[in-house]
């Protein structure tokens, strides 16, 4: 079964045409699964952690192992080492050490989360297809005018084919709410971070094949 999505044919800065394009309901009409999306997005964010945090415990701190003073008779609190965590420049009580936070993401779960997110974007009218987004010059103002024909929202993710136009990259570099990704770079986190997602019409078939 096929779904109909709007595809914008942007001819110039003022006018554009809109046609309906058939897409697979197995990708863009997938049931919404918030629990699966949460699990995959959490795993993606955890996998971004470096895990390089390191602190020194009392065994790692440099210093003498000699007892500072005798146990009794001085009137001061007993102490066994200058490297004690309660001393200044001493070690940390439960020192953090480098470790891996990697979580495995199954392919079937990843595809299900991607299809669920794309379908939710379609249902919320936040995903559109565009035929092309050619810029004559690398001007941010030109890009904003063309995007304004499609949506008034400034938070936009543009997904292109593997060859990204250089002018498009330069024009969007001044806009922190507009990002240009190719088909191989998108992931569940990037899809949910933007209010509007624009897909090039040429990548729809490849995207459906990848997620089928």
Curated annotation (Swiss-Prot):
Keywords: Ribonucleoprotein, Ribosomal protein, RNA-binding, rRNA-binding. GO terms for biological process: translation. GO terms for cellular component: ribonucleoprotein complex; ribosome. SUPFAM superfamilies: Ribosomal protein L4. Residues 54-65 have a biased composition (Polar residues). Residues 54-85 are annotated as: Disordered. One of its GO terms (molecular function) is structural constituent of ribosome. InterPro entries: Ribosomal_uL4, Ribosomal_uL4-like, Ribosomal_uL4_dom_sf. One of the primary rRNA binding proteins, this protein initially binds near the 5'-end of the 23S rRNA. It is important during the early stages of 50S assembly. It makes multiple contacts with different domains of the 23S rRNA in the assembled 50S subunit and ribosome. Forms part of the polypeptide exit tunnel. Part of the 50S ribosomal subunit. NCBIfam families: rplD_bact. Belongs to the universal ribosomal protein uL4 family. This is Large ribosomal subunit protein uL4. It comes from Blochmanniella floridana.
């Amino acid at each position: 079964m096929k779904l109909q999505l709007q595809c914008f044919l942007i001819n110039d800065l003022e006018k554009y045409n809109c046609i309906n394009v058939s897409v697979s309901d197995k990708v863009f009409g997938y049931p919404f699964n918030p629990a699966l999306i949460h699990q995959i997005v959490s795993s993606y964010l955890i996998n971004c952690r470096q895990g390089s945090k390191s602190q020194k415990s009392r065994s790692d701190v440099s210093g003498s192992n000699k007892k500072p003073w005798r146990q009794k008779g001085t009137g001061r609190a007993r102490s066994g080492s200058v490297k004690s965590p309660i001393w200044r420049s001493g070690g940390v009580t439960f020192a953090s050490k480098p470790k891996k936070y990697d979580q495995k993401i199954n392919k079937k779960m990843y595809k299900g989360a991607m299809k669920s997110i794309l379908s939710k974007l379609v249902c919320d009218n936040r995903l559109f297809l565009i035929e092309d987004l050619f810029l004559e010059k690398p001007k941010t103002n030109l890009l904003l005018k063309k995007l304004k024909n499609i949506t008034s929202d400034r938070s936009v993710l543009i997904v292109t084919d593997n060859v990204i136009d250089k002018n498009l990259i330069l024009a969007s570099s001044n806009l922190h709410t507009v990002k240009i990704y190719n088909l191989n770079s998108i992931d569940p986190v990037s899809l949910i971070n933007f209010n509007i997602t624009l897909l090039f019409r040429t990548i729809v078939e490849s995207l459906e094949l990848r997620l089928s």
